[in-house]
Structures are given as structure tokens and as C-alpha cells.
Amino acid sequence: MSAAKLNVKTSSKPNSRIAVEVEVPANRCKNSYDEALSKLSRSISIPGFRKGKVPKTVVIQQLGVKRIQASALESLLQKVWTETLDQEGIEPLCEPELEDGFETILENFNPEKTLILKLETDITPIPTLKKSSGLTAEVENLIFDPKKVDELIEQSRAQLATKVPVTDRAAQKGDIALVSFKGSFSDDGSEIEGGSADSIEIELEQGRMIPGFIEGVIGMNINDEKILKCEFPKDYHQEEAKGRKAEFNVSLEDLKIKELPELNDEFAKQASDKENMSDLRADLEKRLKEDNDRKQAKTRQDSLLDVLVKELEVDIPKSLIDQEVRIIVEQTAQNFAQQGIDVKSMFTPELVKSLMESSKGEAEKKLRQKFALKALAKSEKIEVSDKEINSKLEQVEADIKLSNEKNIDAKRLKEAITDDLLQEKLFAWLEENNTVVEKPPEKARDQIKEKSSKKKTTKTNKEKKSSKTPKS
């Protein structure tokens, strides 16, 4: 026999919260109390009584009425809240908050009387758009720079460079130095955690170490020893080192210089699967242009999404923002871990707190973008068919088989494909129903302004000269 329908009142609150008032009949309260007492009498162990056979009066004497009532109330709250959600069709985003707090309710709880529960919870917001078509977005036109081909080739040259020993001069910028060092803080002489190393290679380029270190090694000769005075940046990742001055006892053990390979067909074969420099350059140019086109498309999408978000009306609950913040911080930690950084030592409670605070703006922006697209899909009835999903799924699964990838979550893969296909349709709709104005890059705009300014100056000078010319 199912429980009688609960008497429930609901009212909307700001930021997608809902207030719920539930009237719990006295008989439900009494039943919950009796169940709690029976459960405790079966589990409690009291000398002189067999387990499970302790009289209820003895249980009450041993545990006290309040403890039994607390157990009864806790169980009652869980059951009543679950029933309320099901009865009212509420989909909460977080655990409910009791208006008066558990302790206050317990203090006034009488199993013989009706209980009035007042709770609040966050619910999924319903986003709406004031407007979704006829909007104008501005986007900077990305112009392909052929110099990037040369930059990539130079990077490959550096990677394929051979290290040649240097013995007849002091260390210079760009050299590779083999050094040993031991660091300590200047203020108290304490050893710096991770501030010592034996015989490691360091490229003498700015930004490789903390300020003052590279500059100090430059000018040293092999077998020289030197004390370098440095200072940790104020935003350094180790909390105890931030902004502190330090001394490093450094010895230069060896010195080498990079010898770059010649730019010929042999280099092209080493650096790629191409047979000659001409083919290598053509391939790099093609890849860079494709990358430029992808970035341009992404920039267009971002600008369209920005103007759409301005038309969004939605109240985002705090619990959703907090959840998104946690995701951002976790992704940040994963990125550092993939770079080989010890996340446990780096992510101190202070840093995590700071990251969570600074990520709130980004979290809210991401959520507003999601809700804007969700509202667009609903208002324009844009959806993805099963046929489209299955067709794309077959393509992706074929690619996965070719790459020998394992441990693929089929459900998540299908969800990701569905999301991607829906986004493609949404942005295609935005492109078709709105205007994107392409403007020249900032550099080009500055050059145009400069030319325009020069023309005006030249014209003014000519006019001045003309006015000074005597009449005939």
C-alpha cells in the first residue's frame, strides 16, 4: 500500500531556487520513531541482554529519547524529500537546505504531532532568448602569414641540431650549460625544496629558470663556481618561495653549442616524410593554412555566441556555478599533471581556494554559453536525428579500430557525437540567420591609420606651402 499523498506547497525563489513546504502527518512521524527504536533495539549491545532482544524501554534509557528522535527524523527527512520530488516532479541540482536547520527541527520534533518541513533547493533554470536572428557580430579576419613556415622549419632545425663542445670561451646566451647547483633562501638560509640538482643541462635562454639564474651563468667558464643571487617571482607556484630572495651555489661543468643542420633535401627527409625542401614547405604551408581556417571558423562561432549570450535571460543557481568551477580547477590540475608537474605538492589548499575564486567568471561565462545554445535549440526546434548520430558513430568507430584505441566508453562516445552534431547545426543556423562583419587584424588597422595619418599630414603641408606661394 503506497503512502498517502503529501500536502506540499512550492514557491519560486531568485537564481533558479525553489522553496518547498511539506506537511508530514503525525502518523508518519510516529511510524518513523517506532521504526528507529526497533532498528536500534536490534543492533544495540547491552550487557545482560542478548543482541536483538533488548527491551525498548531499556534502549530508551541507554540512548536517550533525543538520539532515537534524531535517527527517526533523519530517516523521515530522506523518505519525505524523495516522495516530494517524485510527487511534484522537481529535479533538484543539489541537496536540499532546511530553512531552520536540522538541530532546530530536532529540538521541536514531537513524533505525536504533525511536522512542517521547509526546504530550499536549486533547480535547472529555464533559459529564454529575447532575440536569436538579425544579430550582428564582429570578427577579426585572420590573415595567413607565410613567415610561419620559416618559423616551423627553424624549430625543426633546433630539434635536429647537434651539440658541439665549447672550450675556448665563456658561456653565452643560447649555449647549453651542464651545471650543478644548490639553492637556499637568503633570509634564513633554509634549503629550497627542489632547488638543487647535479649535472643537468640548461639552455641559456630567458625564461628557462627564475630571474637572475641564466644571467648569472652567462659569462662563467668551465669549472667555474659562482654564487648567484636570484629572486622568485611573486606568482611562483610554490607558496613558500613566492617573492623570496635566494642564493644558488652553481658550478659550470661543461658547455656546448647547438650546430644547426643545413636547409637541404637531407634535412627535409630527417624532419618529415617529405623527399625535398620544396615538398616540405608546401606541406607546412597547407597545414598552416588549414589551421588558420579552423581558427577563423572558431572565431566566427565565438563572436556569434557572444552576441547570442547578450540576448539570453536566465538565472543561474550557485550550485551550477560551483560545479563548473570544480570542473575548471580539476582540468587545470590534469593539464599540469600531463606536463609532469607534481600536482599534490603544487595544489596547496590556498592555491585551490584562489583558483576556485578566480574561475567563477569563466564558469559563469561557460554556463551562459551552454544555456544560450540550449535555448536556441528549443526555440528553433533544432535537433539531431538517430540516423545522423548512427552514421557519424560508424565513421568514428571505424577510425577507432584503425588507431587500435581501447577502453572507449560507448555511451560517452555517443553523447559526445550527439553534442558535436547538435553544435554544428546550431552554429550553421546562427551563420545563416545573422550577420558576421569581418574586420582587418589589429596590426593591419594600425597600418591603415598610420597611412591615413601620413596622407593627411602630407596634404596639410602641401596646403601650407601653397598658401605661402606669392601671387603673380
Swiss-Prot record:
Residues 433-472 are annotated as: Disordered. It is an enzyme of class 5 (isomerase). The keyword Glycoprotein does not apply. Residues 174-261 form the PPIase FKBP-type domain. GO terms for cellular component: cytoplasm. It catalyses: [protein]-peptidylproline (omega=180) = [protein]-peptidylproline (omega=0). GO terms for molecular function: peptidyl-prolyl cis-trans isomerase activity; protein folding chaperone; ribosome binding. Its EC number is 5.2.1.8. Its main location: cytoplasm. GO terms for biological process: 'de novo' cotranslational protein folding; cell division; chaperone-mediated protein folding; protein transport; protein unfolding. It is found in: Cytoplasm. InterPro entries: PPIase_dom_sf, PPIase_FKBP_dom, Trig_fac, Trigger_fac_C, Trigger_fac_C_sf, Trigger_fac_ribosome-bd_bac, Trigger_fac_ribosome-bd_sf, Trigger_fact/SurA_dom_sf. Residues 439-451 have a biased composition (Basic and acidic residues). Pfam families: FKBP_C (PF00254), Trigger_C (PF05698), Trigger_N (PF05697). Keywords: Cell cycle, Cell division, Chaperone, Cytoplasm, Isomerase, Rotamase. The keyword Ribonucleoprotein does not apply. Involved in protein export. Acts as a chaperone by maintaining the newly synthesized protein in an open conformation. Functions as a peptidyl-prolyl cis-trans isomerase. NCBIfam families: tig. Consists of 3 domains; the N-terminus binds the ribosome, the middle domain has PPIase activity, while the C-terminus has intrinsic chaperone activity on its own. Belongs to the FKBP-type PPIase family. Tig subfamily. This is Trigger factor. The lineage of its organism: Bacteria, Bacillati, Cyanobacteriota, Cyanophyceae, Synechococcales.
